[in-house]
């Protein structure tokens, strides 16, 4: 199959145009410059940007010579002229510049994690960028597919679509991204990152322009979590000129996707509107029929005004997301999975997530002087979700039934029964309302003193968030294969169903980037003052009186970090860093709870090598946990939301990434490779009620952290035709802490997934592509939680038409 695909791709290469290919690098360090703009003078429609390796390519049909302008923030603009015989594999060097950033540039900079010029090669620590060019290659909807190329980042698949991802970094917990800082445009985007960090909302990946991931000491100024790292979703930017672009996709399993963006800018304002409509029928088949897909709608508006002089700018961002997904926590028994992995029991027919998310941010920039600017952002996020899903059958939890615990055999039979007695099924309305809001301000100053250059940042954030938990359960019976309600529940009634979790957090950070000759140092610290509270009204459903149970906790923590890089020679850099890791606990679900925060000491050592068209980065990391923190969410255990201290843990590993661009016989072969090795073990013994840990012994391996992950991508390009093949391997992964041999009963399957995309550029404005996800139709167990065994997505064909006018 693979040989046939390559032969077809090579045959198609006969249709091509002239190609102008190059790389943009820093003239002083030899390192690639990311997202540099390449524009053909005299033609606004012919242009591109460099990817994370500094590569770019342009189709320049019928041109004997070309004059281009290359721009990048923090660099002097360069204009170059090239003759046709020199179109192939050129290197363009840009000089670093102390050019003053405009307020509009500052707006863009403060929404990013990658600093001036989006150039992570300047950062003395681990920072990965998935650039605009790379995002457009596959144009994925599933965030798991997007970030799988980044070493040191772990994903636990759940629904096959990435609707509610589980992401961790360098051995941190994966559960609902609760141990990382999930951000959009530099603003915390998890529904309640302090009071209830498990994120049941994730921004839609396909509407994003690029993605940034920070790990190690390079992410110290982002809180509250610093043990893992930060992921920043970078939303669509306001275009410089009048523009209308979009993509329409159709595919198997009822997939229909439409994305449109339009906008423009003038000297004093900019405006952009984007919509993303995503609908899928689902790939799982419910016994007796039913919908297993989803319908998701996204709308984004950005408006900017700025002064004539380079003094001030103000940007408004408003977004709205709606989701209705027929997703469940109910998996399969091993026997049923082996017989039909994409089956769903009829008892999950009513399962449905109904969610709405609204965000508003207002960001203002003032240039106080040529080397001092102040940026302030007010943000407000509202999120409501009600995940109505099967909780128990005949009094047994769905987890115990699918684990086939003693006494649950009759309940298992009811999962696919045609008729039952009344009240056989407990379907719970997991109804929550979240709010997070705050004001964050950053002062940035550039100056020189005693032979050293400084970029000093001082920031503070006043933040509050809450999660209002007001749940209930309805009881059903099965009547001729259809669920019929028999006993409606009372809203808020039941243990721990009538609660409010709140958090107030004030944080301050200071960070100085110091450059002395070939040495770049970053020294910083972050201070967090956090107040957490949990109120439980119990049976007082109207909350007319003081809560019957109130639990509070206060935390004050200082999180320092230090990183340094040294430019050994042109294109070769080494770096190291150390920082304190921290993750706050909640107030506890019971009055007697006394949960300690997560604390660790984290080290990294790495090197970067860049020469010609290939780049390599190698990093080793060592995270020494004084105390690990776990939480029993419904996604990982029984859903008590109790937190557990896991004591000492040692997580160490290696991250390797490599990119190259090969030109041969008029064909281009872009290639990238990443590898992650992780060793994660408990360093003390203890007993816990947290299912994934259980009774732990020294040197037990942590669950859901694969030892080895590999990602590779190979492209073939010539003129109007591009095709890319990507491969992802994930080792068998332990599902419960332990040291015993991995089997189907205590681990996921090893996963080897291949995706293919082929694109044809019809003309300057139109392109067509054809994608195959999971080319070999590999069928594996990706998880045994929340309840039962769960499959990956089967092979799927998708076609798309993209336009840009």
For each feature predicted by the language model, list its residue ranges.
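Signature of Gram-negative outer-membrane beta-barrel scaffolds
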Residues: 453-569
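Short, acidic, small-residue-rich periplasmic hinge/interaction motif at the N-terminus
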Residues: 25, 37-41, 71-75, 85-136
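Gram-negative outer-membrane beta-barrel transporters
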Residues: 449-450, 515, 622-624, 642-737, ...
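Membrane-embedded beta-barrel scaffold of Gram-negative outer-membrane proteins
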Residues: 367, 373-391, 567, 573-577, ...
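Short acidic/polar hinge/loop motifs at secondary-structure boundaries
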Residues: 57-59, 187-215
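Extracytoplasmic beta-strand/coil segments of soluble accessory domains associated
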Residues: 144-187
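Transmembrane beta-barrel wall of Gram-negative outer-membrane proteins
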Residues: 250-279, 288-328, 352-369
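Short strand-turn segments of transmembrane beta-barrel domains in outer membranes
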Residues: 217-220, 229-264, 275
């Amino acid at each position: 199959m693979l040989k046939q695909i390559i032969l077809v791709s090579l045959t198609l290469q006969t249709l091509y145009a002239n190609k102008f290919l190059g790389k943009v690098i820093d003239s002083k360090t030899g390192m690639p410059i990311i997202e540099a703009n390449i524009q053909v003078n005299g033609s606004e429609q012919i242009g591109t940007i460099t990817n994370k390796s500094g590569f770019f390519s342009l189709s320049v049909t019928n041109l004997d010579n070309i004059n281009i302008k290359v721009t990048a923030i923090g660099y002097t603009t360069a204009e170059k002229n090239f003759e046709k015989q020199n179109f192939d594999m050129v290197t363009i060097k840009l000089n670093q510049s102390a050019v003053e950033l405009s307020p509009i540039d500052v707006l863009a900079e403060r929404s990013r994690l990658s600093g001036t010029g989006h150039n992570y090669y300047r950062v003395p620590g681990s920072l990965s960028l998935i650039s605009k060019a790379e995002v457009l290659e596959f144009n994925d909807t599933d965030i798991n597919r997007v970030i799988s190329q980044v070493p040191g980042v772990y994903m636990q698949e759940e629904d096959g679509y990435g609707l509610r991802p589980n992401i961790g970094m360098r051995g941190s917990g994966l559960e609902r991204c609760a141990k990382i800082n999930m951000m959009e445009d530099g603003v915390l985007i998890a529904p309640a990152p302090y009071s209830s960090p498990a994120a049941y909302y994730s921004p839609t990946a396909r509407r994003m322009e690029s993605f940034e991931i920070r790990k190690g000491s390079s992410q110290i100024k982002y809180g509250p979590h610093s043990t893992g790292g930060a992921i920043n979703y970078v939303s669509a930017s306001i275009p410089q000129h009048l523009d209308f672009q979009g993509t329409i996709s159709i595919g198997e399993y009822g997939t229909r996707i439409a994305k449109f963006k339009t906008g423009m800018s003038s000297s004093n304002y900019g405006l952009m509107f984007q919509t993303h409509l995503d609908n899928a029928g689902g790939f799982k088949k419910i016994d007796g029929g039913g919908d297993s897909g989803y319908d998701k709608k996204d709308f984004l508006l950005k408006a900017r005004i700025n002064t004539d002089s380079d003094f001030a700018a103000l940007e408004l961002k408003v977004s709205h997301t709606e989701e209705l997904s027929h997703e469940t926590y109910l998996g399969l028994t091993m026997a049923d999975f082996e017989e039909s992995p994409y089956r769903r029991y009829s008892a999950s027919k009513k399962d449905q997530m109904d969610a709405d998310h609204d965000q508003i941010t207002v960001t203002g920039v003032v240039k106080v002087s040529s080397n001092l600017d102040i940026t302030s952002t007010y943000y407000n996020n509202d999120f409501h979700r009600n995940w109505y899903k099967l909780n128990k059958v005949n009094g047994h939890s769905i987890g115990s039934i699918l684990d086939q615990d003693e006494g649950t055999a009759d309940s298992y039979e009811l999962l696919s029964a045609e008729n039952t007695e009344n009240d056989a099924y407990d379907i719970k309305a997991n109804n929550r309302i979240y709010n997070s809001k705050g004001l964050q301000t950053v002062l940035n100053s550039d100056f020189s003193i005693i032979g050293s250059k400084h970029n000093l940042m001082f920031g503070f954030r006043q933040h509050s968030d809450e999660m209002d938990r007001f749940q209930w359960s309805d009881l059903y019976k099965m009547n001729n294969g259809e669920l019929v309600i028999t006993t409606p529940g009372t809203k808020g009634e039941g243990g721990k169903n009538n609660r409010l979790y709140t958090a107030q957090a004030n944080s301050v950070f200071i960070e100085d980037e110091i450059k002395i000759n070939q040495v770049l140092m970053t020294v910083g610290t972050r201070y967090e003052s956090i107040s957490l509270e949990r109120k439980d009204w119990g049976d007082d459903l109207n909350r007319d009186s003081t809560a019957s149970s109130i639990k509070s906790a206060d935390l004050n923590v200082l999180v320092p970090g230090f990183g340094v890089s040294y430019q050994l020679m042109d294109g070769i850099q080494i770096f190291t860093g150390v920082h304190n890791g921290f993750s706050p606990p909640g107030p506890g679900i019971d009055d007697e709870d006394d949960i300690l925060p997560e604390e660790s000491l984290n080290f990294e050592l790495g090197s970067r090598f860049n020469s010609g068209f290939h780049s390599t980065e190698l990093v080793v990391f060592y995270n020494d946990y004084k105390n690990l923190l776990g939480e029993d969410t419904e996604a990982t255990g029984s859903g008590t939301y109790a937190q557990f201290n896991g004591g000492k843990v040692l997580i160490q590993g290696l991250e390797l990434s490599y990119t190259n661009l090969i030109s041969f016989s008029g064909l281009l072969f872009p290639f990238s490779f990443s590898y992650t090795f992780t060793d994660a073990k408990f360093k003390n013994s203890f007993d816990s009620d947290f299912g994934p840990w259980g009774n732990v012994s020294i040197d037990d391996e942590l669950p859901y952290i694969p030892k080895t992950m590999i990602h590779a991508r190979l492209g073939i390009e010539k003129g109007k035709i591009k095709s890319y093949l990507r491969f992802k391997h994930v080792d068998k992964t332990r599902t419960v802490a332990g040291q015993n041999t991995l089997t189907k009963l205590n681990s996921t399957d090893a996963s080897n997934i291949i995706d293919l995309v082929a694109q044809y550029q019809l003309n300057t404005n139109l392109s067509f592509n054809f994608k195959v996800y999971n080319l070999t139709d590999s069928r594996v167990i990706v998880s045994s939680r929340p309840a039962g065994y769960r499959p990956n997505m089967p092979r799927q064909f998708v076609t798309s038409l993209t336009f840009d006018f």
